Amino acid sequence: MSITIKKASEIAKLRRANEIVAKTLDYLKQEVRSGVSLKELNRMGESYIQSLGARAAFKGLYGFPAGVCTSVNEVIIHGIPNDYILQEGDIVGLDIGTEVDGWYGDSAVTLSVGNISPSDVSLIACAKDALYYAISIIEPEMRFKELSYALEQFILARGYVPLR
């Protein structure tokens, strides 16, 4: 599978959906703190998405019950918001998708709740650096397999092992 270049009109539609994702993540970043539940973060995220004229794309997708995926600590991705209350030292991933007029936006962030261990700081930095590395090397018609291999090598060189 190759990466398809979109037309300017399609990019504008994708941009709108992704702007709402970015605004929602920025909003939720301010709410991530000790004492807040994952269900509350989801409620705030869904309401905010709707207030901006979009639909929470993940809600109902394959039966997923929420608009915001909340992954805490050992949960890798696509965690379901529950009654868990965030605590100092937690690492939380927020993954959000929006739909506007049939066009989708999707992004995620990893955040710390207060202070986290140096090893956790290093792991998060590696993930962020890997993202920027991928952006710097991606080219039109590049195959996902090629990009995945390059990222694997980047991560291994930093002393981490990608999930399989």
Where are the regions a protein language model picked out?
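Active-site neighborhoods and metal-handling regions in enzymes and metal-associated proteins
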Residues: 1-164
